[in-house]
Amino acid sequence: MAATSDEQMNLLLSSFDQIYEDFKIGLNEINVYRSKSNVESSRREVLEISNKNLKEENERLKKLYTESLNNFADQLEHRTKCHSLKEELKRVNDENKSKEHEHRNALESLRQKHVTKVEELEYKIRSLLVEKATNDMVIDRLRQDLTANKSHIQAMSKKLDRVVTEVECKYELEIQDLKDCLLMEQAEKNDISNKLQSLQKELLISRTSIAEKQRDTTSNRQVETLKQKLMKLRKENEILKRKLSSS
């Protein structure tokens, strides 16, 4: 764009120089025509017309020159503005390049952080998947163990119920046997007590008889026999007492 403006300016300057040269030639011709006006009256009108045309052309050229100067001034101002704009553009471009560099660095840093974060998350996900698989295996094994334990507990419960029933039946039978034995021993005890009372009565009678017949040998033997029976009954009575106490 600047090269085009320079070319236009050079073209205008060249045209201006040419016009100026034409203007000087025209003035010279006018002077020549004026000096020869007395001689060449026949050509005066033509020269006047030419002069008029030249004046008009001169005015036109002046206007053109003025416009060219204005354009040149505008172009100079435009060049100055363009230079300022170029400087501003360069500054903005430099700032943009700096910002782009910072932005690229920031993006690269964010990308690296993102990559690192993604890798960490992927590692955590893999670890969690492995842990989940392990937990699933443990849960399956525990469920199998729980099922097996439930079956074992049910079997043991049934077995325990059966054993309890058997033990209860056994103990009921043993208790009934013990009750029967106790009743029998109680009956024996009562019988022995009755016998003991009878023997005590006999002993009392025997003692009375012995007192009357102290010298009677037969009575002595009877007393001795009664004593032995009494001792035997006492021993049996003690044995029954111990049995009853232990029962």
From Swiss-Prot:
Q: Which UniProt keywords apply?
A: Cell junction, Coiled coil, Endoplasmic reticulum, Host-virus interaction, Transport
List the GO terms this entry assigns under cellular component, sorted alphabetically. endoplasmic reticulum; plasmodesma
Tissue expression as described in the entry: Expressed in leaves (at protein level).
Where, if anywhere, are coiled coils annotated?
Answer: 39-126, 182-247
Superkingdom per UniProt: Eukaryota
Where does it reside? Endoplasmic reticulum; Cell junction, Plasmodesma
Q: Which GO terms describe its biological process?
A: intercellular transport; intracellular transport
> Mostly located where?
endoplasmic reticulum
Domain comment, as recorded: The C-terminal part of the protein in required for plasmodesma localization.
User: Whom does it interact with, and what assembly results?
Assistant: Interacts with viral tomato spotted wilt virus (TSWV) movement protein NSM, which is involved in cell-to cell spread of viral genome and enlargement of the host plasmodesmata size exclusion limit (SEL).
- What this chain does, per the record? Involved in intra- and inter-cellular trafficking through plasmodesmata (PD).
Q: What is this protein called?
A: Protein At-4/1
